[in-house]
């Protein structure tokens, strides 16, 4: 059952995407009105506005992504105050990176770290522009950080995927370490694996591409092509290995398409012994790991118009999808590769299209589903 918990009128124009911080109860929006807004995920505090970031981009902000904490979301550094940072990709072909200064509070650093969920999500923090990243020739369609916050991926209508490297502690410089030209059309989305340096891109050319560094850690290249959709692939997300339904011997990916389908793809994971054996080969014959991906499942057909967004919960293993028909659909896996519909919510944003769904946790750690639509609303749902 999908029940509306709260509705936020975030913008007077379309909300393209939403990002949730991996460890803090805070979300960010991306809108056609060229601004980003941050809200605290606290029902007790009535989901207050934390910050508004504007006057930087000349055109729509299409995508936002919070940087994970140092050490990753699963194992953040416990003795380090990791200040939140946000990347925003725009149709003006640039990416902005935002962050906050260390809070000016009367506590010592240990107390600040212990209470960071409150202190770092306070409206009293000032969000500052830290960097503008330039490189793409056309609109930036999506941005996403890897699980350690060292790499930022971006994609564009210029058919390319770029990978930028930075020092996750300072975010002072962003160096382009790869420009990947494997797609033949507009690239709609990029998404990193939650705990591995593997990247997926989704495109207007109807394919998904998988990228990984070579064994020596020098070059990034395409190691897998997922063919099967018969229309634009709008979005793809990896399954978290923390999920209660995850199999540690394989990788899985869910994708959403213009062809009205939601698909699950699977590939075997290479074991550490195999990787070590390849490292011991001479570099002249050492090859990148090619990954063979197959369709494991096509989820039950529900959507009548293009599916724009999918989200895979690390907490429950449930998948949510949404798109042009205004429906939110939630699916559960009953046995390996067999999925059933949990619930369908029609008209989740009235007559408007839904551009994004993500899973998030409130400050009380209860999981919710967040949706964003053409109506300018961000809706929070109990599942």
Swiss-Prot record:
GO biological process: iron-sulfur cluster assembly; tRNA wobble uridine modification
GO cellular component: cytosolic [4Fe-4S] assembly targeting complex; nucleus
Localization annotation: Cytoplasm; Nucleus
Residue windows of the WD repeats: 10-49, 56-108, 135-175, 182-221, 228-275, 302-341, 349-383
Main location group: cytoplasm
Family assignment from sequence similarity: Belongs to the WD repeat CIA1 family.
The protein's assembly and partners: Interacts with NAR1.
PANTHER family xref list: CYTOSOLIC IRON-SULFUR PROTEIN ASSEMBLY PROTEIN CIAO1-RELATED, WD40 PROTEIN CIAO1
The protein, known as: Probable cytosolic iron-sulfur protein assembly protein 1
Organism listed in the record: Candida albicans (strain SC5314 / ATCC MYA-2876)
